């Protein structure tokens, strides 16, 4: 992780295996955020062809760089996606994506895991649970994810709802119930 993209220039013409691991969501208390997902694929590259590598930031120290949603009040984030892009720097140039894990909401349940194909949903028994993003739609929740971005978590009535991780489509952010009970 560097906080910026890195450039890879193919040294020879041939088939390359690409791998990416999404970042872990932010932790609080005794529980960790969801683990990041894993993706792999192969691509044919000509000598000198350029790929842009984005390594997602974890949800605590690196603020969910590359799409992790924010959990206000706790200042933690969902994990950022890790991806590889070809032909440019935009989200539409991504050719391989591994989703970041969701942040913890409460201190008693882990966040949802990041996906390769589909991310995991939040864990808990109160409020609105965030669902994982997929290749075709963002995760839903109290605040839904969007293209490339996890939904924000919620801090209300002294309760926390976890933030979604980044991905092709980001995971949804969780909410809290009316009494402020934590959701994950």
Residue locations for each model-derived region?
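Non-catalytic, beta-strand-enriched accessory regions in extracellular/secretory proteins
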Residues: 1-8
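C-terminal subregion of chymotrypsin/trypsin-like serine protease catalytic domains
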Residues: 172-184
